[in-house]
From Swiss-Prot:
Annotated source species: Archaeoglobus fulgidus (strain ATCC 49558 / DSM 4304 / JCM 9628 / NBRC 100126 / VC-16)
Gene: rpo10
Enzyme class: transferase
Protein name: DNA-directed RNA polymerase subunit Rpo10
Subunit structure: Part of the RNA polymerase complex.
A GO BP entry: DNA-templated transcription
Chemical reaction(s) catalysed: RNA(n) + a ribonucleoside 5'-triphosphate = RNA(n+1) + diphosphate
Cell compartment(s), UniProt: Cytoplasm
InterPro entries in the cross-refs: RNA_pol_su_RPB10, RNA_pol_suN_Zn-BS, RPABC5/Rpb10
Main subcellular location of this protein, as a coarse class: cytoplasm
Keyword Zinc-finger found: no
Cofactor requirements of the protein: Zn(2+)
One GO CC term, this protein: cytoplasm
EC number, UniProt record: 2.7.7.6
Stored SUPFAM superfamilies: RNA polymerase subunit RPB10
Length: 76
């Protein structure tokens, strides 16, 4: 079953792994601010992300959906 996905945020966590704060809805806006030339610090400050654990979620996120999709159906 093919599920339509937003390529920008489809694999970004909905909640922070450490504190559980809901952050997933902010990822697209974060990426937009970066594309406008803002630094990660400026973007996160403007979004109101203050906790270090939540900031880490944005700064260290690496999308691997395309790489993993090559193996869809290969196991089994």
């Amino acid at each position: 079953m093919d599920v339509p996905r937003n390529e920008n945020s489809s694999d970004f966590p909905i909640r922070c792994f450490s504190c559980g704060a809901v952050i997933g809805h902010l990822y697209d806006e974060y990426k937009q601010k970066l594309s406008e030339g803002k630094s990660p610090k400026e973007a996160l400050d403007e979004l109101g992300i203050e906790r270090y654990c939540c900031r880490r979620m944005f700064i260290t996120h690496k999308s691997v959906i395309k790489e993993l999709s090559r193996f869809h159906g290969a196991v089994g």
